[in-house]
A protein has these predicted regions:
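Compact integral membrane and secretory-pathway proteins
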Residues: 2-151
Length: 151
């Protein structure tokens, strides 16, 4: 296969992956994202939709008490969505490869922080969280498949 044909195939696959990823990402906000751990003899655990999780974690950015507790990881997870939107905006500028790559790395690190938070609190991830992560990774996979463009 010629280099140009391979490049076109990779570009098409990345575009399809990003579009599919964005659709899954948005869909995940309307699904149950996590719930509290059930305790024997206790009330039914609270279940949180993805949109509620996103809102609560982003709003808590402005709480100084949160930054000095174990819940600061929730604030970091709240910044995944704005960072992903910034990443999508930067896709409009092909020469901004390195800022996109740095954002992608930060997003992946914040995802790991979310999982640590789930273990500490403890929360149980549900289908909305799994699809949210899958959508994000489908969007970001293009960074692993592309080489930096020569300037």
């Amino acid at each position: 296969m010629a280099q140009g044909a391979r490049s076109a195939t990779v570009s098409r696959a990345v575009l399809i992956s990003r579009i599919l990823g964005f659709c899954v990402y948005v869909w995940a906000f309307f699904l149950p994202a996590c719930r509290e751990v059930a305790t024997p003899g206790g009330d039914a655990p609270d279940v949180f939709l993805g949109s509620r999780c996103a809102w609560m974690t982003l709003v808590n950015t402005f709480s100084h008490e949160i930054w000095h507790s174990k819940y600061f990881l929730a604030v970091l997870s709240g910044w995944i969505n704005p960072l992903l939107l910034l990443y999508l905006f930067l896709l409009l500028f092909p020469k901004l490869f390195w800022p996109r790559r740095i954002l992608a790395g930060a997003i992946v690190a914040f995802i790991a922080g979310t999982w640590v938070l789930f273990a500490i609190i403890p929360l149980v991830p549900l289908i909305g969280h799994v699809l949210w992560i899958a959508g994000i990774l489908l969007i970001l996979i293009g960074e692993a498949m592309r080489r930096p463009e020569r300037i």
